[in-house]
């Protein structure tokens, strides 16, 4: 993402938040800590929301803190939605970069779908409840 290397695990799609923050701190001369993010009440509420909506079992969380010393697996690994929220917390201008990246990726995939996009939407809407599409 931009000038930052983002690491994602294949087994669960979690992202390494510690690695991203380390890169940010080195580039900007900052001293932010992942635990600062976890200390926010809004973070706790968001974690609860992810757990509720993604049907996490008790004792299973949308993040994992690893102390592994080998293989680059150390750090805090986060569910993709939690990672996006974390990345936006780092800095307001970085928040813009994160949102722009997500938006651009959405448009890119829509453009890749091209002429098939309306057909795809129709097919998806035929298998989902009608009230899902009402605002």
Where in the sequence are the language-model features?
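An anion-engaging/catalytic patch
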Residues: 1-134
